[in-house]
From Swiss-Prot:
Subunit structure: Homodimer.
GO biological process terms held by the UniProt record: D-ribose metabolic process; pentose-phosphate shunt, non-oxidative branch
Annotated gene: rpiA
The protein's name: Ribose-5-phosphate isomerase A
Taxonomic lineage of the native organism: Bacteria, Bacillati, Cyanobacteriota, Cyanophyceae, Synechococcales
The entry's keywords: Isomerase
Binding site for substrate: S30, G31, S32, T33, D87, G88, A89, D90, K100, G101, G102, G103, K127
EC number: 5.3.1.6
The keyword Isomerase belongs to this UniProt entry's keyword annotation: yes
Disulfide bonds: none
Length: 237
């Protein structure tokens, strides 16, 4: 029997698919919930229920999965606009600000989200938080030659950084762009995401950080109500 978290993720992935229509250019996110959405999309396309779909992936992992499922893909540079991007998040606060980058894909994810006419975030209820960064560390992608410099600069603004290490190889995680990732914690969490996003990105050697500010249009939240998985839609007023 599936655990409750998996049931929530499956419910929210299916709800997201209902927003997809024929002829759309789609941003296909990364992570476990987004992977369930991509699988559901592949099933809709193969059954003929969705036609003329083009996907733009946010990670190599997503590209491999979409290709295996027969979803037509284009590179980011080949599209001028994305109709709808669907992606997960590691944390979401009440103002729709996000932390992403648990899979070290946040650079491509932010590019796709910023190009999308509509950006829908799919999460289970455990990802909804009052304050960002109290539980999940903020990923910052850095040039390999600059990681120590960036770590010191982040320390000057109150952050404690750790170089993200790989689990199945000796050494650090290397992103799809060939860079390294610092995972950063701020005491008391992040109370002003908009200012901090710019502040970190202004440090020389930083490519991008995992704060997604004012990008999400809707958050679909998988939840369990009376033992049954369901989905709650949160939209900006």
């Amino acid at each position: 029997m599936e655990d409750l978290q998996t049931q929530m993720k499956e419910a929210v992935a299916k709800a997201a698919i209902e927003q997809i229509h024929d002829g759309m250019v789609l941003g296909l996110g990364s992570g476990s919930t987004a992977a369930l959405m991509i699988k559901a999309l592949g099933a809709k396309i193969s059954s003929g229920h969705l036609k003329d779909i083009v996907g733009v992936t946010t990670s190599f992992q997503g590209e491999v999965l979409a290709t295996e499922l027969g979803i037509p893909l284009q590179g980011l540079s080949a599209v001028s606009q994305i109709d709808l991007a669907i992606d997960g998040a590691d944390e979401v606060d009440s103002n729709f600000q996000l932390i992403k980058g648990g899979g070290a894909c946040h650079v491509q994810e932010k590019l796709v989200a910023s190009l999308a006419e509509r950006f829908v975030v799919v999460v289970d209820s455990s990802k909804i938080v009052k304050t960002l960064n109290l539980t999940f560390k903020l990923p910052v992608e850095v040039l390999p030659s600059a990681w120590q410099l960036v770590k010191n600069k982040i320390h000057e603004i109150g952050g404690v950084s750790q170089l993200r290490m790989a689990q199945k190889k000796a050494g650090p995680i290397v992103t799809d762009q060939g860079n390294l990732v610092l995972d950063v914690t701020f005491a008391g969490g992040i109370n002003d995401p908009q200012t901090l996003e710019k502040q970190i990105n202004n440090i020389p050697g930083v490519l991008e950080n995992g704060l997604f500010v004012n990008l999400a249009d809707e958050v679909l939240v998988g939840e369990i109500v009376s033992g049954t998985p369901g989905v709650k839609s949160l939209q900006k007023i």
